[in-house]
Amino acid sequence: MNKSEPGAASRRPLSTPLPGVVETHLMLGQIHLDQGRMDDAFLMFEAAARSGDPRAVNMLGRAHERGWGTARNPAIAALYYTHAADSGYGWALFNLADLYLAGQGVRADPCRAHVLYVAAARAGVAKALNMLGIMAEQRMVQAARPANAPVFFHAAAMAGDCWGSVNLARLHLAAGQTAQAMPWLRHALDHGFGDVPAAIATLVATRTEPCLRALAREATRRMAAACR
């Protein structure tokens, strides 16, 4: 697969990768990605994807979605995600669901997104449980029930998803259950990354409880440290 063949993922059947080669390419790709060497990362993901391994095909789709070493193109990303998802690979199912929910690269289809999130959750992707909670809370599809949102958020949090913890804590705070919210906020702050500290700081910004004020200060410190 290469940049000139965006449809290759949908045409080639999955094949058995050479032992260790795909893992090496994926590992090197991630290292390059972490170091900001996007062009090198793309080359590694592209090389790995030639095997047809769904993990590698998914990462090549991710590169096209995010613009890692290539022009950002969610439509091409959707082709690769679909190819990898056809084998039942959980992260490809999740990433494809994100595109359908946002209407990026494909026509927006919340119902299709919901089906894919369910499949991703069944494949062990905890983040999919959190998304099912959001879809239930906002009643994005007819099958979703707001009353089920806490169940999905709790399942996501128990499976280690930091956003599941944040959303579960948010529901507890809205219900006036500060004591129940604190463990989930603490778990999210201790294990989360990226925008999690900012989300927690915003969530508790107007709260007056001493425990939440202390948590807000800690979240703000972590945000500042991340910017250094």
Which residues does each predicted region cover?
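TPR alpha-solenoid repeat register
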Residues: 24, 56, 92, 128, ...
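Canonical positions in the second alpha-helix
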Residues: 14, 47-48, 82-84, 118-120, ...
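Terminal, low-structured helical/coil segments at or just beyond the last alpha-helical repeat
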Residues: 2-14, 192-228
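Short helix-capping/linker turns of helical repeat alpha-solenoids
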Residues: 20-21, 51-53, 66-68, 87-90, ...
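Hydrophobic face of amphipathic alpha-helices that form TPR/SEL1-like repeat modules
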Residues: 25-32, 57-66, 95-102, 131-138, ...
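Short, charge-rich amphipathic alpha-helical segments embedded
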Residues: 47-59
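Structural signature of tandem alpha-helical TPR/SEL1-like repeats
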Residues: 5-8, 34-44, 71-80, 107-116, ...
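N-terminal leader/linker segments that initiate helical-solenoid repeat arrays
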Residues: 1-31, 35-36
